[in-house]
Each structure stands twice: as C-alpha cells, then as structure tokens.
C-alpha cells in the first residue's frame, strides 16, 4: 500500500517529511507522513482553487457593479466633475442607475435610467441634482432634477468644502472659531411657516413683524406656505422637498375666489419685503405648497456714506500734514 502511494508522488518531497518523524516505528511513521503530506497537498490545491474562484467571481461582481460612463461633450471641467459626482451618488443609491424625475413636457413623474436621462444634457446650461430618495417596494430611486449650472456648481463646491472640513477636523487642524463661524452661518437662515388660512390681521401684524425683524438683522428667511396639515409634525420640512414638481391633488380643486385670496397673500408678502429684501425666489403654486426665499438687501446708501466719510478723513489728514510742512518751511526761512 505504501509502495503504491510512493510511486504516485515525488520521492524528494516525501523524503523530507518522512525523515522528520521519529524512526522508532518506521511503518507507523511512514503512514503518518504520507497522510500528512497528502492532506497538505490537498489544502494547497484547495487554497489555489479558492483563489481562482474568488478572483473569477470578484471580477464578475466588479464588472457587474461598474456603472456605464457618461461622456460629456459640453461644459467646463468643473461642471463635468460636478455632474460625475451626482452620477456616483445615483449609483450609490441604486446600483442599476434607475431614477425618478419630473418630465416637464408630459407634466408627469416618470421612471428612467440615469444613462438615458444624462444624454444630451448641456453642462454649460444645466446640471444634475438629487432632491429626494424614493423608497419603492423593490428598490430605492433617486429623484433627479435638472438645475442651472450655477446651482449645480454651488452644490458641488459645498460638498468639497464639507469634505475638506471633515479632513481638517479629523486631523485637529481647525480652530474653535471656525466651528463657531460655521454654526453662525447655519443659524443665519430662518424658517417661517405660514398657513393659507391665515387671517389678514395676523399676516399684517405678527408675521410681518417676524419677517421684517429677521431681514433687518441680516438673516436670510424662507417662508413656507401651505395648508395646516402640511406644516405640522417634526418632519414638516420634508413636505416641501419636491415643491416645484409636485402637482396638487386632483380631488382637491380650489374655488377661483380661494385662488385669488392666496395670490393676494403672496402679493402682500412681496410688498412687505420690497424695501428690505432682494427679489424673492418663489417656488411652487398657489393651489398647493410654496416656498418664498428672501435675502436681506444691502443698503447701498450706507456703504456710500461710509466710503465718503473715509475719503473725508483721509483728505483731512493730508491737509493737516500739508499745513505742518508749510509751517516748517516758514520757520526755516525765518531762521535763515
């Protein structure tokens, strides 16, 4: 039995295993050595085969998960980076690249694939943004929206800034003042809820006071206008995430008089902030939900007055210096 096994294996490899055993019982030791050598050979072959299997199947997984590249033919390098960043976010959410978007031509929310959606996008005019994540029964779908290039680049710059901040924070290179300033910038945006059912007296007094006082302090203000049920709860802001694409419920048709009243509220708000805010950015519809974004207006007269005062002081210093020089010359002439 031992002889037949030895004939099937290289003698040199077996000999080293055999000699390492105790020579007290040659037959027993020979059997143990052969058994150990066979097991070792089997383990090596198993590891080798396992590596081949893992390499083959991991390669398949990598090929399967690799998203199809989109070649951009327009836009700056920065715009392309911003678009590719959004593509990667889409594939992180949905490995197949499936998305949901609002079709402005049909006026409907439709499902598609990011590869198809990205075709023909002019990055010099538009960019891509993910405004929400939709959970279906089978998968998660990023809700994608076309935005202007400026907005897309701003969002990408914010992402890079946050990423850099996290890196510096982890390295302990950011001073405390930086965090305080960041918190101040976040607190600079104020949110005010307004119900469509608000009374004119409340709008003209309490809400008007809240809005104007915040703008005068230099705060940006977002006005969220909707029915009361959309303004309640701790997560009420989620109701305004897709306010541009959202269509009002077909069952809920408002009377013309109600539409007119709501439009009157909007006009009152615009008139209220006309002197202290830049042109409001209005999103949504009067028969649904709306967001009015307000930015405090920089008082040009104040800045002009400050510059004038600075120039006046500078001129006064020059005149004072000239007088000193003149007096010095006069004294020198008198001494001569």
UniProtKB/Swiss-Prot annotation:
Task: Please list the residues that make up the transit peptide in this record.
Answer: 1-41
Which Pfam families does the entry link to? mIF3
Source species: Candida glabrata (strain ATCC 2001 / BCRC 20586 / JCM 3761 / NBRC 0622 / NRRL Y-65 / CBS 138) (Yeast)
> What is the first-listed, main subcellular location in coarse terms?
mitochondrion
Checking InterPro entries in the record gives: AIM23
| Entry's Gene Ontology BP terms | mitochondrial translational initiation
The listed locations are: Mitochondrion
> What is the recorded name of this protein?
Altered inheritance of mitochondria protein 23, mitochondrial
Family, according to the entry, reads as follows: Belongs to the AIM23 family.
- What keywords is this UniProt entry annotated with? Mitochondrion, Transit peptide
Molecular function terms, GO-annotated: mitochondrial ribosome binding
Q: Name one GO cellular component term.
A: mitochondrion
Where does the record place the region Disordered? Answer: 47-67
């Amino acid at each position: 039995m031992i002889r037949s096994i030895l004939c099937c294996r290289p003698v040199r490899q077996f000999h080293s295993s055999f000699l390492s055993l105790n020579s007290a019982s040659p037959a027993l030791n020979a059997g143990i050595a052969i058994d150990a050598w066979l097991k070792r050979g089997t383990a090596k072959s198993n590891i080798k085969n396992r590596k081949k299997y893992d390499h083959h199947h991991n390669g398949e997984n990598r090929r399967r998960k690799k998203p199809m590249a989109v070649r951009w033919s327009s836009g700056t390098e920065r715009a392309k980076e911003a678009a590719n960043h959004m593509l990667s976010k889409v594939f992180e959410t949905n490995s197949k690249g499936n998305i949901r978007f609002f079709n402005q031509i049909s006026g409907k929310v439709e499902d598609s694939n990011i590869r198809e959606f990205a075709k023909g996008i002019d990055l010099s005019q538009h960019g891509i943004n993910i405004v929400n994540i939709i959970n279906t029964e089978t998968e998660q779908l990023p809700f994608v929206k076309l935005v202007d290039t400026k907005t897309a680049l701003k969002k990408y710059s914010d992402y890079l800034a946050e990423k850099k901040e996290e890196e510096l924070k982890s390295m302990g290179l950011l001073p405390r003042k930086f965090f305080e300033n960041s918190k101040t910038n976040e607190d600079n945006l104020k949110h005010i809820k307004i119900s469509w059912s608000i009374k004119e007296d409340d709008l003209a007094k309490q809400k008007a006071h809240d809005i104007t006082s915040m703008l005068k302090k230099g705060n940006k203000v977002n006005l969220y206008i909707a029915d009361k049920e959309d303004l309640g709860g701790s997560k009420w802001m989620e109701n305004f995430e897709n306010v541009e694409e959202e269509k009002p419920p077909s069952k809920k048709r408002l009377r013309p008089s109600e539409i007119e009243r709501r439009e009157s509220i909007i006009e009152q708000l615009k008139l209220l902030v006309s002197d202290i805010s830049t042109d409001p950015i209005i999103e949504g519809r009067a028969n649904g939900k709306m967001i009015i974004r307000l930015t405090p207006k920089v008082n040009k007269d104040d800045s002009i007055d400050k510059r004038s005062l600075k120039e006046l002081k500078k001129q006064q210093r020059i005149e004072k210096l000239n007088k000193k020089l003149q007096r010095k010359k006069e004294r020198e002439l008198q001494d001569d």
